Amino acid sequence: MSALDGKTGSGSLPLVERVPPHAFFVGSAIFHYLGPSFAVLLFARVPVAGVAWLRIVSAALVFALWRRPWRAFLAAERPAQWTMLALGGVFATMNYCFYRAIAELPLGTVAAIEFAGPVALALAGARSRRNLAALLLTVGGVYLLTEVRFGGAPHAFLWAFANAVLFTFYIVLAHAVSRADPSTSPIDRLGASMIIAGVAISPLGFSAAAPALLDPVALGAGVVVGISSSVIPYVFDQLAMRRLPRSTYALFVALLPATAVIIGVIVLRQVPSALESVGVLLVAIGVALHRPPA
């Protein structure tokens, strides 16, 4: 039995149960944007749609070889199957929109915009002055970010805002998948969703990725992007979501915009301006302040 699923020895806790859920979240936060920063570097060799395809399909292959997740899909009840199908569709479209956005905008800017949706969703589900203030702060931060760069790449912001909407669906569906069926592992359900995403994105991305399949360097880089972007962070997300209350998880999510900025500076040399830094800070405060519905 895998240490992700069961006991590691007689009477002992599974290995993952001995790791604090906060540690999984920190690992997820780092890899969530480290992988895309590598993808930006890969854009010089492979078109955006091709990189998105490489990311998702390589992750799907890892899950297929590691977990054989179709068994969890076939064993699940019909509502859980629909949830996995929906999450797979969101994975495919969200990653494509995200890559189209970061191809032209700084990673930190796209990451900050990403959180407008979850904060708005929190206000819709739990109307309070706290959530209203959180939304106003987030909107103010996003406004500053778009004001700085909108004139240079207006269409890129359309992709960024589409990604924000899809990221909201990801949070809702990923929480549902993590708790969908106690008889199967959440990692297996995640893997099934990733395979579905690979099928969904193939009509759009395969032809763009085809040249990379004959280029060992580009292909290897694509696999690294897939593992660091769609295997490690999503697995860590599932392990954190399963043990953290939604309110606590939402608070930790406030760290992600700052994480994206730091990785953008280190890996991509994307140093934000003073106004952009204020925008990211406002978004982070807004995300930390908001409280999702119970």
Pin down the residues of each PLM region.
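Small-residue-rich packing faces within the transmembrane alpha-helices of Major Facilitator Superfamily
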Residues: 33, 57-61, 119, 139, ...
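C-terminal-most transmembrane helix of multi-pass membrane proteins
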Residues: 2-8, 56, 254-294
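Hydrophobic transmembrane alpha-helices of multi-pass small-molecule transport proteins
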Residues: 63, 116, 129-149, 163, ...
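Glycine-/small-residue-enriched transmembrane alpha-helix faces in small-molecule transporters
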Residues: 1-50, 89, 93-97, 136-143, ...
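Juxtamembrane helix-entry segments on the extracytoplasmic side of multipass membrane proteins
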Residues: 17-21, 45-53, 76-81, 142, ...
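Hydrophobic alpha-helical transmembrane segments of multi-pass membrane transport proteins
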Residues: 26-34, 38, 66, 85-100, ...
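Specific alpha-helical transmembrane segments that line the substrate/conduction pathway
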Residues: 50-60, 91, 98-126, 163, ...
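Membrane-interface interhelical linkers
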Residues: 1-30, 59-86, 127-133, 150-152, ...
